[in-house]
UniProtKB/Swiss-Prot annotation:
Keywords annotated in UniProt: Cell membrane, Membrane, Transmembrane, Transmembrane helix
GO CC list: plasma membrane
UniProt organism field: Exiguobacterium sp. (strain ATCC BAA-1283 / AT1b)
Main localization (coarse): membrane
The family this protein is said to belong to: Belongs to the UPF0154 family.
Disulfide bridge partners, by residue number: none
Transmembrane spans: 4-24
Keyword Nuclease listed: no
UniProt-recorded name of the protein: UPF0154 protein EAT1b_0403
Amino acid sequence: MSTLFWILLVVAALIGGIAIGFFIARKYMMNYLEQNPPINEDMIRTLMMQMGQKPSQKKVNQVMRAMNVQMKNEKKS
């Protein structure tokens, strides 16, 4: 009987640890994305206007493509 109790206790602790870890990781990622939002097209347009450039859709697409390529290269390294 005590062996079955210990097995159930270990399984319950494992499931509890996984659940708690999931919620901690979720909260961490939500805080991270709130503090460091991903860059989108509107942010690039605003940045170009602040620099005195006229943000055409072609330029915005070029910058987005260049940033995506750079992010992929950084992930591979």
